[in-house]
């Protein structure tokens, strides 16, 4: 079996290339990452990077360049390397999925270059940050993932982020220092190179690595800043990254997880934050620099409004309880329909009314849906067991609920008229 030539190691900036097909397989189902795939194709050469090293695979297109099916285009939706074989998973019409694809045929391939380049920017940025953290604080990078996607299908605007984990915790001030140094490395336009040292040479080199590797080790070197074992494509110069921004952190397995965006992802994120700032500024009717003070004022006003609302709800609940108690007579049910108060206030009404209602049943229906065909209820009584009544109520009014002998609660799927009719029949 001839191995696929890995163009992404020869030049990470190759975004389109011709290739010859070496094998085609029709799939009964696609891989986990790309269930829509129905074909797996091997090429004599490829610039599509397969998933690995914490980075998702490249995607793009594969176009037939000759024969009866010349010009037919397939979507490359996933790329995986298994047992030394690089499989390109394609999406196509299953009725004629493999037509035009056969060993020996030539295809023209193109990467989703903007997505690939964003991954390169962010992966190299991760090496820069990890190298600085390792040098300054001695912590190891123990986990890494980068993912880049389009916001919407066909949209040129990219989103995504990098997460990476360190073996120790970092303070906010330390992270700010790391970010400043990382962006200084970007501005320094350091050369980024990759090599495969011989095993005997590797023994004498100092480099970062998550695994104990002894052969086919690819080292990515960033100026005099960092050397790390890595299988992924990188930018050729740190200046290609543009900017590195550490967004937030969280404690993770005794260390810290960092969320980062670099390059075009950071640029898009900055644009989003500017738009959000402008939106909040308009909402608060204040310039951006006054947003913190505006939010403080809004919070204070909301707190005052909440206090007033609580006081008004209490007063309204007390008034409703008095009304309900007055309507309870001759053992007939006292029923109230309430659309303003919530569950806590309704329970308060029932609890306050039951002692004054004597043998009468006290029922409050509240929180109706938009068309008034469903209600919640709380029903209490100082005499008898309400649980058999709950079954009768639920059966008659398409309800659900239950509770204790002295109080039941639940929902009914009925209108106010239907509920009133039920209680009229109940009282005779």
List each model region and its residues.
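A glycine- and charged-residue-rich anion-binding loop/surface
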Residues: 1-428
């Amino acid at each position: 079996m001839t191995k696929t030539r890995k163009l992404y190691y020869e030049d990470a900036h190759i975004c389109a290339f011709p290739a010859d097909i070496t094998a085609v397989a029709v799939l009964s189902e696609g891989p986990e990452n790309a269930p829509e795939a129905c074909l797996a194709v091997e090429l004599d050469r490829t610039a599509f990077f397969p998933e690995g090293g914490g980075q998702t695979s490249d995607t793009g297109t594969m176009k037939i360049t000759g024969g009866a099916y010349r010009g037919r285009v397939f979507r490359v939706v996933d790329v995986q390397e298994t047992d030394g074989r690089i499989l390109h998973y394609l999406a196509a019409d299953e009725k004629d999925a493999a037509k035009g694809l056969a060993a020996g045929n030539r295809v023209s391939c193109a990467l989703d270059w903007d997505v690939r380049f964003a991954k390169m920017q962010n992966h190299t940025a991760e090496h820069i940050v990890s190298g600085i953290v390792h040098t300054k604080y001695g912590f190891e990078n123990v986990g890494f993932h980068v993912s880049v996607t389009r916001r919407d299908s066909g949209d040129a605007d990219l989103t995504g982020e990098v997460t990476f984990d360190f073996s120790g915790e970092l303070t906010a001030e330390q992270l700010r220092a790391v970010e400043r140094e990382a962006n200084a490395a970007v501005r320094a336009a350091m050369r980024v190179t990759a090599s495969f040292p011989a095993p005997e040479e590797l023994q004498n080199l100092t480099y970062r690595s998550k695994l104990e590797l002894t052969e086919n080790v690819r080292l990515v070197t960033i100026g005099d800043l960092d050397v790390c074992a890595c299988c992924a494509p990188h930018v050729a110069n740190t200046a290609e990254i543009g900017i590195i921004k550490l967004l937030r952190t969280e404690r993770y397995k005794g260390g810290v997880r960092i969320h980062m965006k670099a390059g075009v992802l950071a640029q898009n994120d900055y644009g989003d934050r500017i738009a959000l700032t402008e939106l909040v500024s308009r909402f608060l009717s204040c310039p951006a620099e006054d947003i913190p003070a505006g939010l403080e004022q809004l919070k204070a006003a909301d707190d005052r409004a909440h206090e007033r609302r609580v006081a008004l709800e209490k007063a309204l609940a007390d008034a409703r309880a008095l009304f309900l108690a007055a309507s309870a007579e001759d053992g007939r049910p006292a029923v109230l329909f309430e659309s303003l108060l919530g569950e806590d206030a309704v329970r308060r009404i029932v609890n306050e009314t039951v002692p004054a209602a004597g043998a009468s049943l006290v029922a409050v229906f509240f929180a109706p849906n938009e068309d008034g065909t469903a209600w919640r209820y709380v029903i209490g009584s100082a005499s008898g067991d309400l649980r058999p009544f709950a079954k009768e109520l639920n059966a008659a009014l398409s309800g659900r609920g239950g509770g204790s002998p002295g109080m039941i609660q639940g929902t009914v799927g009925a209108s106010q008229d239907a509920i009133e009719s039920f209680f009229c029949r109940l009282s005779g």
